[in-house]
């Protein structure tokens, strides 16, 4: 049990640092638009055109659970289909996973015990609402031995994601900036240690391609050790520019976990020498919808 509380070791290419201020901007693409002073933030546009109703969601459930209406709902559906179609075109197999997982699954991908207080739980049944499709999709391969010739395994999934986001407040969480329930398309890859970093680059290129097709200015950051997740060996964040808010919004994280998750979930493959070894797991958001919609509006 003590070993489950030990985080992953950072890759040698991870910058030293304690916070987001120490992250390294690797690339920035797209022209930053200049709006007039009368430009409205997305939450005002949503209210004016009645396409996302935050007050109604607050009435039904609480803050952070918006109701998408009319063209807002259609835009959500269109973006989800676009992201899934692009993933399939790039070799990812679509699956539709459960939105709840058991404790073993959450332990296997490292959400537990690290994110215990951040996940919505259903104690009566011993289930957790998923914070990302990474959890159920990666667990498809828990307790399996794959054949090397079948690697890489590439999967994509659309799901709603649920996060408590305890302690979040202020203008940075207004509107669609930070929600408790949101839509996201996730890409997951299982590969050999020899090829996993090639896959990482392909996944980064896939995410960049989506943002370029949406014509959104974006930048890629290599996260420092202090800003990475508990489970990651290396992570790249993608941020888009919100012209109305005049700031960058994170819309994707692409990570290589190396053998951290596979060791917890006993995900192995038989190599060319006949030896059974741990695989590398990778995943990325491709993409998370709320902030994409915020930037588009």
Positions of PLM-derived features:
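N-terminal alpha-helical targeting/anchoring segments
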Residues: 1-33, 47, 51, 55
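TRNA-recognition modules of translation machinery and tRNA-sensing kinases, especially anticodon-binding
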Residues: 28-297
């Amino acid at each position: 049990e003590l070993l489950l509380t030990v985080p992953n070791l950072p890759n040698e290419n991870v910058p030293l640092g304690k916070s987001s201020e120490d992250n390294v901007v690797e690339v920035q693409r797209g022209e930053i638009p200049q709006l007039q002073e009368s430009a409205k933030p997305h939450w005002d546009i949503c209210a004016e055109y009645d396409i996302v109703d935050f007050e109604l969601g607050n009435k039904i459930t609480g803050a952070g659970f918006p109701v998408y209406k009319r063209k807002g709902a259609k835009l959500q559906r269109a973006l989800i289909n676009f992201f899934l179609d692009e993933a399939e075109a790039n070799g990812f197999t679509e699956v539709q996973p459960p939105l709840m997982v058991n404790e073993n699954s959450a332990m296997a991908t490292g959400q537990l015990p690290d994110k215990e207080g951040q996940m919505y739980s259903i104690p009566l049944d011993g289930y957790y609402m998923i914070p990302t499709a990474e959890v159920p999709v990666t667990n498809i391969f828990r307790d399996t031995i794959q054949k090397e010739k079948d690697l890489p395994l590439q999967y994509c999934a659309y799901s709603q994601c649920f996060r408590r986001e305890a302690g979040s407040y202020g203008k940075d969480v207004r509107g669609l900036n930070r929600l408790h329930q949101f839509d996201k398309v996730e890409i997951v890859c299982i590969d050999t240690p020899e090829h996993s970093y090639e896959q990482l680059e392909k996944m980064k290129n896939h995410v960049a391609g989506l943002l370029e097709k949406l014509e959104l200015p974006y930048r890629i950051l290599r996260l420092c050790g202090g800003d990475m997740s508990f489970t990651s060996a290396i992570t790249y964040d993608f941020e888009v520019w919100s012209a109305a808010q005049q700031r960058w919004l994170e819309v994707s994280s692409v990570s290589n976990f190396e053998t951290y998750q596979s060791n917890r979930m006993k995900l192995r493959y038989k190599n060319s020498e006949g030896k059974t070894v741990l695989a590398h797991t990778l995943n990325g958001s491709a993409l998370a919808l709320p902030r994409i919609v915020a930037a588009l509006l």
